[in-house]
Each structure stands twice: as C-alpha cells, then as structure tokens.
Design a protein with these regions (language model features):
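Substrate-recognition "cap/lid" segment bordering the active-site pocket of phosphatases
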Residues: 93-96, 122-175
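Active-site neighborhood of HAD-like aspartate-dependent phosphohydrolases
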Residues: 2-50
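Short, acidic loop-to-helix structural element flanking the phosphoryl-transfer center
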Residues: 2, 6-9, 88-117, 123-127, ...
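An amphipathic alpha-helix signature
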Residues: 28, 32, 45, 53-61, ...
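Hydrophobic "anchor" residues on beta-strands that sit immediately upstream
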Residues: 11-13, 116, 173
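A metal-dependent, Asp-based hydrolase signature
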Residues: 54-89, 99, 107
Length: 177
C-alpha cells in the first residue's frame, strides 16, 4: 500500500478565517467602516482577532461589548448591513493565505486527498474569498454557516462538510476550529 493510496481515502477539512487565510485585516477594515457610519470607533486589529470565527454579527456584538457600547437591535442590524456591504466589495484587499498554507494545500493535493472548507462565513462570502484568491479549484466542497443544519462548533457542520466532499468521517481530519 502506497502513501498516495492512503491519502486518497482522506478528507482534509480546513477552517477558513484564522486558519487557512488571514482575513483579519479586511474584516477589521469592514468593521471600522461600519462603526464609522454610526459615529463610533471600532476596536483595534489585535483585539478583533479574538472575536473572529462565529460570523459577522457575533463579531460586531463582541466588538461593541469590548468598547462597552450597548447596541439596540436596530443599531446591530444597521452595523451588520454596513459591514457586509463594505466587506463584499473589499474582502481580499489584504487577505492572504497564512505562511505555509500554500505548501500544505499542495502537499494534500499531490497525494490526492480530498480537501474541503468548513466555515462560519456564509457560503457566498466563503466562495468569493476562495475565488478571489484563486483557490476554488483546490477544494471539492465548501460548506458555509448558512448551508449547514448546525454551524461550528457543532460537529454536525464538520460531518456535513465531509459528506458533501463524499468522504468518510473516520477518514477525515479537521485543521482549525
């Protein structure tokens, strides 16, 4: 049995934000824009990094809490829409693969492993980031938070991603959270 044969049975699932790609600078720019539309300052980039991973709305809420700002439901919705509008138009200005990830992806591809993305980004935003970074063709499946029955940290999200990739959960590995 060759190593390639073993790898061809594997499904390697990556988290996107903070694992595969460093999206924090572009998320921060969108957050600053959204908060400025309401006459507010946003948190700094290092603080923002700890709020990433549970979706834009949660990031906005955590950011406001860090600044001791109580948001009304209307303010949250306004900030969320301003954030998304800006982010969609500017999502890969500064976003890049983390160091070593290009080599990691190529390592998996050279061994015929199936690769997939399991992310708390929406499906459309995840696909847009992958497309703009010329990564779409490396992944057999992408499952965003809005296309799963239970988003991460639920294991259901991972299981559904592996299934979408036509993999087996006992032959899958998750890289990221």
């Amino acid at each position: 049995v060759t190593q390639a044969m073993l790898w061809s049975e594997k499904t390697v699932v990556f988290d996107m934000d903070g694992t595969l790609v460093d999206t924090a600078p572009d998320l921060h720019a969108a957050l600053c824009h959204a908060f400025s539309t309401q006459g507010m300052e946003a948190i700094d980039l290092p603080t923002l990094r700890s709020t990433i991973g549970h979706g834009a709305r949660a990031m906005i809420e955590k950011s406001a809490a860090e600044l001791k700002i109580e948001l009304t439901a209307n303010q949250l919705e306004t900030l969320h829409l301003a954030f998304l509008d800006y982010y969609r138009a500017n999502m890969t200005v500064h976003t890049r693969l983390f160091d070593g990830m290009d080599e990691t992806l190529n390592f998996c591809l050279e061994r015929d492993a199936k690769m997939a993305i399991c992310t708390n980004k929406t499906q459309a935003l995840a696909e847009q980031v992958l497309s703009e970074l010329n990564l779409s063709d490396k992944f057999v499946a992408v499952l965003g938070a809005d296309k799963t029955s239970e988003k991460k940290p639920s294991a259901v999200h991972l299981k559904e991603t592996v299934s979408l990739a036509k993999g087996k959960i006992d032959q899958a590995v998750m890289i990221g959270d």
